[in-house]
UniProtKB/Swiss-Prot annotation:
Pathway: Steroid metabolism; cholesterol metabolism. It is found in: Membrane. Heme binds at residue 462. The gene is CYP82J17. The keyword Repeat does not apply. Mainly expressed in leaves and seed pods and, to a lower extent, in flowers and stems. It is a single-pass membrane protein. The coexpression of CYP90B50 and CYP82J17 in the yeast strain RH6829, which was engineered to accumulate cholesterol, leads to the production of diosgenin, the main precursor for the industrial production of steroid hormones. InterPro entries: Cyt_P450, Cyt_P450_CS, Cyt_P450_E_grp-I, Cyt_P450_sf, Plant_Cytochrome_P450_Monoox. It comes from Trigonella foenum-graecum (Fenugreek). Keywords: Cholesterol metabolism, Heme, Iron, Lipid biosynthesis, Lipid metabolism, Membrane, Metal-binding, Monooxygenase, Oxidoreductase, Steroid biosynthesis, Steroid metabolism, Sterol metabolism, Transmembrane, Transmembrane helix. Gene3D superfamilies: Cytochrome P450 (1.10.630.10). Coiled coil: none annotated. This is Cytochrome P450 CYP82J17. GO terms for biological process: cholesterol metabolic process; saponin biosynthetic process; steroid biosynthetic process.
Amino acid sequence: MDSFLSQPITIVLAILSVLLYNIWKIRKPSNKFQKGMKLPQLSFALPLIGHLHLLGNQIPLAKTFASFADKYGPIFQIRLGAYPTLVISNKEAIKECFTTNDKILASRTKSTHGILLGYNHASFACAPYGRFWAKIRKVTMLELLSSRRVESLRHVYESEIDTLVKDLSLYVKVGKVEVVISEWMERLTFNIITKMICGKRYFEYLQDVDDVEANGNIVKLIKEVMHISGELVPKDVIPILGWFGFEGEVLKSMKRVSRDLDEVVGKWVEEHIEKSDDGVNNSNEKQDLIDVMLSVIEDDPDSGNDRDTIIKANIVNLMIAGSDTTSTTMTWILVLLLNNMNALKRAQEEIDQHIGRDRKIESSDIKNLVYLQAIVKETLRLHPTLPLSIPHEATEDCNIQGYYVPKGTRLFTNVWKLHRDPSIWLEPEKFSPERFINENGEIDHESHQFEYLPFGLGRRACPGSMFATQVIHIAVARLIHLFDFEVPINEVVDMKQGTGLILSKFTPLKVLLTPRLPYELYQ
């Protein structure tokens, strides 16, 4: 956001604000649906820029919107440049949006992000609601991320976790050793996702940071994508700037990153096409996701997207959704356990009780590790994958909580605020995995419907949630089973968050690791 406000746009705005004020005026609602109350709206909107001037600081947008909700209520309207935007953070509004009005609110906004990083909105995450989106969503759910497909790829993430554990044991060996564990989590999740997508892994865990940066250009690109995905492109909210050919630093960076990404993923697709043409792949060989997409995705003349473009768009989508988000969640789990050592001890005792100390944990064991599952759920409550949802757009006029919402209104769900609502959660700022365990000692899956949304809700809910939680559970379980974790002497665990799309930990997480099981279990 700072990069947006730091541009010399203010000069342009000062000159144009009087002449072009009428362009900014709120569009009149259609006469056929003028029912309902007027939405609470923030004060101090300015011509052309709306309320953008209230967002220009280092506070994450979800937290800024939460402070607005404290003043205006859990459903309010803010104007982002030329566009009215609805922000909701209570379960009643969320239920109405994603049940009664789910279809109306299932579309995405047209954006520079979708054009450049989504290959002109060709991925399932950013395509507008309609026939093309439904087609790609079906392919994703049935072919790429179905329970059958995830199970067929289980060997990928289990073998990668085995490799990480082995290399960690070589690094730690005996005694306490300081490890920047957040970097290991990043390499783990990126190796898993690229191996699933294209059959390649990019890192050995014992590489130093300089080697990673030199050899892992794709990782650097993904990090840049995650950063700029949380930034506004000026012309997306003030269209007049596009007419004058204005390009800010965010747009310039986005164009560069999209070119570099296309070169990498385009090469992956070409390699798979060549192998297929040469008859290298056969029905008995384990297929990666590019193989699958090449076999099920076709050109789509109606949307103007050819097969390879659709595949590349969804490769990028899968990498963004499956790498940085998962490693961030695992890092926050370890942060919270280090700050709550009794919870870490209880989790280790649960594992020792059910698995023992003479064999490694298998995926089939996770169902018996109730407290571990509760730890993951509680971490996702405090640190949801997307604290602020990717914006939706209303395709028709509708009513939400008695308020009139006109067609074209954009919608944010403030998950961060919802998950810390004191009317829902007892001591919402406290880390308490027990809140997700019912009186029978089982995970409570029923009590928090429309109150707990770590992976979204409705038609646009994250299709990869099952895969992500499986990886998180087994990786964290293996780590805390095999190692004791401590904070380095004279250090505290810094809880500061970044300001990007997923609010990752601002500083790397350093821990002291000590092996706790027989040597052969690390091999």
